[in-house]
Curated annotation (Swiss-Prot):
Purpose: Located at the top of the head of the 30S subunit, it contacts several helices of the 16S rRNA. In the 70S ribosome it contacts the 23S rRNA (bridge B1a) and protein L5 of the 50S subunit (bridge B1b), connecting the 2 subunits; these bridges are implicated in subunit movement. Contacts the tRNAs in the A and P-sites.
Quaternary structure and partners: Part of the 30S ribosomal subunit. Forms a loose heterodimer with protein S19. Forms two bridges to the 50S subunit in the 70S ribosome.
GO molecular function: rRNA binding; structural constituent of ribosome; tRNA binding
Protein name: Small ribosomal subunit protein uS13
Length: 128
C-alpha cells in the first residue's frame, strides 16, 4: 500500500482514483499530477514502482496544501470571518447558509432538524 501525505492508498484501485482519496485532491488535480509525473492514470496502485511513488509524494507534499494543513487553513479562514464580524462570519456563527441560499424553506442540512413542538408520546393512562 502506497502512503502519500499520510494517507494509505488502496492497492486495488487505479492511481487516478486513489489520489482523490487525499483531502484537497480532486479528479482534475489528480489527472494533472499524473500528467506531470508521466504515470498512466490506469495504473493500479500495487503496480507503481518506488520511484513513481516518490515522484508523486514529492509533488504532492512539496507543492500542494493537503490533508491536515488544508483542513486547518479552512478552519482558520472561517474563524477569521467570524472574528472580523462580517456578514459571512455571522452566517457561520448562526449556522445558516453562507452563500445566499433561501432559508424561509429548505436549508435543513445547515439548520439541523426542525424543533419538535407539541408532540407527546402516548403513555399508559392513570386509572386504566
Amino acid at each position: 500500500m502506497a502512503r502519500i501525505a499520510g494517507v494509505d492508498l488502496p492497492r486495488d484501485k487505479r492511481i487516478e482514483y486513489a489520489l482523490t482519496l487525499i483531502y484537497g485532491i480532486g479528479w482534475t488535480t489528480a489527472r494533472k499530477i499524473l500528467e506531470r509525473t508521466g504515470i498512466d492514470p490506469w495504473t493500479k496502485v500495487r503496480d507503481l514502482t518506488d520511484d513513481e511513488v516518490q515522484r508523486l509524494r514529492d509533488i504532492i507534499e512539496k507543492e500542494m496544501v493537503v490533508e491536515g494543513d488544508l483542513r486547518r487553513q479552512v478552519a482558520m479562514n472561517i474563524k477569521r470571518l467570524i472574528d472580523i464580524g462580517c456578514y459571512r462570519g455571522l452566517r457561520h456563527r448562526m449556522g445558516l447558509p453562507v452563500r445566499g441560499q433561501r432559508t424561509r424553506t429548505n436549508a435543513r442540512t445547515r439548520k439541523g432538524p426542525r424543533p419538535r413542538i407539541g408532540v407527546k408520546k402516548k403513555g399508559k393512562q392513570a386509572g386504566s
